[in-house]
Every structure is written in C-alpha cells, then in structure tokens.
UniProtKB/Swiss-Prot annotation:
Residues 22-177, 192-319 form a propeptide. Keywords: Cleavage on pair of basic residues, Secreted, Signal. Residues 158-176 have a biased composition (Low complexity). It comes from Apis mellifera (Honeybee). This is Prohormone-2. One of its GO terms (cellular component) is extracellular region. Residues 136-145 have a biased composition (Basic and acidic residues). Residues 1-21 form the signal peptide. Disulfide bonds: none annotated. Residues 51-69 have a biased composition (Polar residues). It is found in: Secreted.
C-alpha cells in the first residue's frame, strides 16, 4: 500500500516539473531561441540601445532581414519558421510609428514624453513659480491675466498616420513650444510689504534729526552744573593789546593827477613804494649826484632822473688786527648771568 502512494507522489511531481518546464506560449519560445542564436556583441548593443528607437535601421535594409543558415536550420528543425515570419509582419507597423515620432523626439524630448502618457485633456500651465512670495488671491489674479494675454495653452498630440515635411513639422514644434511656455509678468515684491510709508518717513526724519541736533551737551550740563569749562571762557579785550597800525595802511596813499605825472612815471615798473624818496629825503639820490663820483655808474632808462636811481655802491675796508685785540672782550656784558634780573638788558645772545 505504501509503495502505491510513493509511486503516485513521484508521478505527480514529475508532471508538475514537466508543466513548469513547458513555455506559456510560442512567442516567448521564439524570443528565447533568437536570443540564444544571436552573438553576445549584438545582444549587448541591443541592451545599450534600449528605449532609443531613432537609432534602429529601417526594415527595408536587406541586412536586417537576412538570417544565417544555422538559424534557418534550427528553426526548420523546430517547426517555428512560419511563426517567426508572422511575428516580423506584426512588428512592422509598430516600428513605422516609432520612426514617425523619431523626429519629434530629436527636437524636443519632453514633447514626446508628455504625449506618451496619453493626456487627451488640454493642459493649462497656470501655476506660478513664485508661490513663495504670493498668496492664493494674488496667484489667481496672475493666472487670469496670463490667460487673457496668452489665450489657452494646450498640448496637441501629433498625427502619426502620415509623415509630414520637415518645414511643416519644425513650425508645428515651434508653435507647440510657444504655447507650452507660460507667460508671467514682472514680479511685484512690494505686495508682501506690510510697512506703512509714513512710518518709514517718520523714522528716517527722527534718525536724521538725532544725527544733526545732538542734545548730549544738555544732559552733561544738568549732571555737572557747577563745572566751568575753561576752554569756553573768552578773555576780555584789553585796550593796551590793540595794535593801532593794523587798521591803517602800510604806505600813505598817493593821489595822481594829470599835472603831477611826468612822462617818466608812465610805464615804469614800481619797485619801491610811492613815498620812498620823500621818506628818506632823497639821500640816496644826492649821494650819487655829487661831483665826487662824476657821473652815475649805470645809465638811466629815461633822460629825466625823477624816480629811478643807480644802486648803492658798497666798499670793504680791510684793517690789520692789533696784538691786543680781544674779540670776546664785550661778550661778558651780554651774558644773562652777569646782570641782575631786574636790569633791562638787551635780548640778544653772542655765540
């Protein structure tokens, strides 16, 4: 009895293993055979190219439809040759659709990604990126303004039935991009400010008044009332300190008239004050006009000698020193320590 149960369990296990080993459908079996028959380099290239349909070669190329003799033999032996041909015919329209969409994928990758999701309802891009600075009411106002300005912005799925010309497709892509981009006005950050401008003006005026009219002197005088600032005291003017000659002119004024002017006074450069010879009584002019020197040493610019005179001559007289000459004989009387402090001595030092 036990042997029968054991044989029954073994047969059930073997049946389960056989069922699990069988493929679910013939399509998966053909795919597995294709993968085993292809070399590893082609399989690695296909894995790298997964999802990028634009790099696939079209079906018209004879190299893609060509199969090796070894692959044909294996398919003929397994009886799957007709099934492979049917699968290739089914894959042809799907590949043609991907080729039609390849142009849009090259120009705008997001465009194809949006359309693959299958959105049939028009999408309105009214969400403001400035959610950090605006409230819901402000966002609603901005969305209404942008809707009025730009109209309805929608995404339209391109037709995949017929391949359009390059110029028409480029124009459609550009218009589609323009419609998708939302138009925003310049942000107004002053909406967030809760400060009253009058309060700001009062604060600024108080700050400026505090800088200009500082009243810390008043507080210091209240704290130290009996303190007298010696620097602020002004000495009374003494009548003895007033110098009378500062108010008067340095040289006495000289009034000219047409009768008093001589031709020699016109155009002469004044190198001396007007009352120069009147002050010294023409002592320098008389010195050189005497017959001791004959004629003046230097010629005059004008024939009339009324104002300009020759320069003074200076002579050096050399004397022999005597043996009893003491150059420091008179130095003692000018020393400060030799006389009493009360005596009005001359303020000079001898070196």
């Amino acid at each position: 009895m036990m042997c029968d149960w054991v044989w029954l369990l073994l047969t059930l296990c073997s049946l389960l293993m056989i069922v699990q080993s069988l493929p679910t459908n013939l399509a998966e079996d053909t795919k597995k055979t294709e993968q085993t028959m292809r070399p590893k380099s082609k399989r690695a290239q296909e894995m790298l190219m997964f999802g990028n349909q634009q790099n696939h070669q079209p079906e018209n190329n004879p190299s893609s439809s060509y199969s090796s003799t070894a692959e044909k033999r294996t398919l003929a032996a397994s009886g799957l040759g007709g099934l492979k041909a049917a699968l290739i015919e089914e894959e042809k329209p799907s590949r043609s659709n991907t080729l039609n969409n390849a142009f849009y994928d090259r120009k705008n990758y997001d465009y194809g990604a949006v359309n693959e999701l299958g959105y049939e309802i028009p999408q309105v891009w009214d969400n403001s990126p400035y959610s950090r600075y605006y409230t819901n009411e402000d966002r609603r106002k901005r969305s209404e303004k942008s809707a009025v300005a730009s109209g309805s912005s929608t995404t339209i799925k391109p037709s995949t039935t017929s391949f359009q010309s390059p110029t028409s497709t480029q124009q459609s892509v550009q218009t589609q991009v323009k419609r998708n981009v939302p138009i925003y006005q310049e942000p107004r950050f002053k909406r967030e400010l809760d400060i009253d401008p009058e309060d700001v003006l009062t604060l600024l005026s108080l700050w400026e008044n505090e800088r200009r009219k500082r009243n810390w002197h008043k507080y210091m005088n209240e704290e130290y009332e009996n303190v007298d600032d010696e620097d602020n005291l002004l000495e009374e003017e003494d009548s003895r300190n007033i110098i009378p000659w500062m108010d008067s002119s340095v040289y006495p004024p000289r009034h000219y008239s047409l009768d008093s002017l001589s031709p020699s006074d016109i155009g002469i450069i004044r190198t001396h004050p007007s009352s120069y010879y009147e002050q010294y009584e023409n002592q320098y002019g008389q010195q050189y006009d005497t017959s001791q020197y004959g004629s003046p040493q230097y010629g005059l610019v004008y024939p009339q000698q009324t104002y300009y005179s020759a320069p003074e001559k200076r002579f050096m007289i050399s004397r022999k020193r005597s043996q009893a000459y003491d150059p420091y004989s008179n130095a003692a009387q000018f020393q400060l320590s030799s006389q009493s402090r009360g005596y009005p001595y001359q303020h000079r030092l001898v070196y």
